[in-house]
């Protein structure tokens, strides 16, 4: 039986979602474990985060991954990794620790883990974490959320159906309650539950990963188990969900559905517009306004209540897009952008805005160069679009 797996990887950004881990027991053709490697080790979205739980732990800023699930087998075990990214993996180091046992009962259940996603979640239907058929016991999951609307993503009731029942024998009271926390989620780690990732702003694009392990309280089933959770109260949200479920059951198991392609697993890794350079903002004095200047280009932005921050979106190199936020604004609030130019040169100006239910409508009103002023047509950007 395998008792411990350790890996550390050097690869392109978001490799945790691009490298697929599979495990096969006793010569089976269909894997009993199939998941992006980062999600299997408890952290979603292809990101690296520390995590400390009983069966899974990650350290070194999430780059050292350890698994302690017991994985028995009778005759053989085969573990594979497949790189579905565009670049070769620079380094892949691993240990797999196992012991030869005198014997195992023939009905010993084997370890299973499956990645699923629904992007976006469908109205009127619970998100399905696991559907398994046979005899075994469910031992937990992790769930990753990418917000498509602002606010609290939770309040979805968990519903677990055992052996084909029409009404769930386990019916919870809210997302954070199933994941053993309360009054929302915050980053925390415990032996059987925790939250390695919760971006604090709860804005469009914010990401979270939570976990719950039923080790002292496994959920047994004789014929089948179906583990589901609402996405928002009464399924009123359409966030992007992904998960890994963990369970033990006797083989053969039903084959898993085909894993979604890598680009579908990374909806937040946005391609950069051409010639885009991230600014280095420095606050400057500008009377009653908030003003920031890019230390490299000299570009300045001034407005009321202006705050630089990092957005929840990443480019394809793994860097988060910076943003300037204006808060406490009303109709007519303005932001003024200025930058040095060379006399006689021509310039194209491209403005990029994030969209979301709290982003407002933006009107580009005109360009002023010294004593010259150029009026633009009322070019309205509807930031309320999703």
Task: Give short role names for the model-derived ranges.
Residues 162, 268-386:
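Extracytoplasmic
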Residues 1-276:
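Beta-strand-centric surfaces of beta-sandwich/beta-rich domains
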